[in-house]
């Protein structure tokens, strides 16, 4: 790489081919948003090397996740053989696209120098952030610097037309449980609109912006057989609503069953534990999108109070439903940003069923 940079710096040398590779989504959660790499090839020759800014120790998911929550997840850049890189992603049945970057000699030299510096032992590690500092934004920033800010000049002030949460929902569209959990665990910072520049944390958005601004058309090197179904139905919200409806029904009929008390406790424990999890994440994490979570107004570890049969339990159930009405009004007025409607309806159904089951008339029955 250093030799190539020195050659390009001279006016008589032809720059190497610099390619942006975009890899499609995979089957595991770490690959739901795709991936990007940047490769160097000598003109007219096979082979080449790729730089991967998304290298991490994925064999230890628990420490990696805890590090992510604290903003301490260590990622690094690795240099790999181009052919082996493409073959690996093809074997994973992930689409591979390339864009040859139309760079002048000076721009190619600047980009090569920046890539070499980024791969140096003292610079190769960085603290990963899904939106702000990932495998794609690292390449985006180096490329933008090399071409004199042409990528950022217009995209930083142009809206992508979507929020960060919308991008998350697209990435998790095939996984109902992850979608439902994202509604409960990811906070209000994800509901602000993303600029086109910010949207380039996604490899596909970066690919599209590079094509539009630099004229680098994507070429498909491998096409995945995976069927891409557009996300039209809010399945995460439907999952939350389904749980609330089923739980309310079971609570309504459980008062005549022998183990009704245990069943009611179990059904109420689920949102309580989810609230506990969301609260612990908010306390432990440092990322803004995980700390300020409006869903904690709807699900809390104190939901077990709704099981009480005394005055405190009655006040809790009725007070919570009243609070839900206020939350709905604040959401409609734009004060609260998160899409809380499914959890509000689900918890209202559950607390309403408990209130009916705990009424004196129902107890006598």
Where are these regions (language model features)?
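N-proximal short alpha-helices
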Residues: 80-84, 112, 277
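A structural motif
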Residues: 103-116
């Amino acid at each position: 790489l250093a030799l190539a940079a020195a050659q390009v710096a001279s006016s008589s040398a032809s720059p190497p081919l610099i390619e942006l590779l975009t890899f499609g989504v995979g089957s595991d959660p770490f690959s739901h948003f795709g991936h990007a790499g940047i490769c160097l090839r000598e003109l007219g020759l096979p082979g080449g090397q790729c730089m991967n800014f998304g290298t991490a120790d994925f064999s230890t998911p628990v420490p990696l996740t805890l590090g992510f929550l604290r903003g301490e997840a260590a990622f690094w850049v690795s240099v790999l053989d181009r052919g082996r890189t493409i073959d690996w992603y093809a074997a994973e049945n992930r689409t591979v696209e390339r864009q040859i970057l139309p760079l002048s000699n000076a721009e190619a030299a600047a980009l090569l120098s920046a890539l070499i510096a980024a791969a140096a032992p003292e610079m190769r590690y960085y603290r990963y952030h899904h939106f702000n500092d990932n495998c794609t934004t690292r390449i985006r920033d180096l490329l933008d610097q090399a071409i004199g800010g042409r990528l950022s000049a217009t995209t930083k002030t142009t809206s992508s037309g979507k929020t960060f949460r919308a991008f998350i929902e697209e990435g998790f569209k095939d996984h109902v449980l992850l979608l439902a959990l994202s509604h409960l665990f990811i906070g209000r910072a994800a509901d602000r609109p993303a600029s086109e520049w910010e949207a380039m944390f996604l490899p596909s958005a970066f690919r599209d912006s590079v094509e539009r601004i630099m004229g680098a058309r994507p070429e498909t090197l491998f096409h995945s057989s995976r069927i891409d179904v557009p996300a039209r139905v809010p399945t995460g919200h439907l999952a939350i609503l389904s749980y609330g409806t089923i739980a309310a029904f079971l609570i309504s009929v459980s008062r005549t069953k022998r183990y009704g008390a245990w069943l009611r406790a179990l059904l109420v424990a689920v949102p309580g534990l989810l609230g506990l999890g969301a609260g612990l994440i908010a306390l432990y994490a440092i990322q803004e999108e995980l700390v300020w979570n409006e869903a904690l107004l709807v699900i809390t570890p104190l939901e077990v109070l709704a099981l009480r049969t005394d005055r405190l339990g009655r006040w809790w159930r009725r007070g919570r439903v009243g609070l839900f009405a206020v939350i709905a009004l604040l959401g409609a007025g734009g004060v609260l940003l998160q899409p809380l409607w499914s959890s509000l309806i689900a918890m209202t159904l559950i607390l309403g069923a408990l209130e009916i089951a705990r009424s004196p008339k129902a107890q006598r029955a």
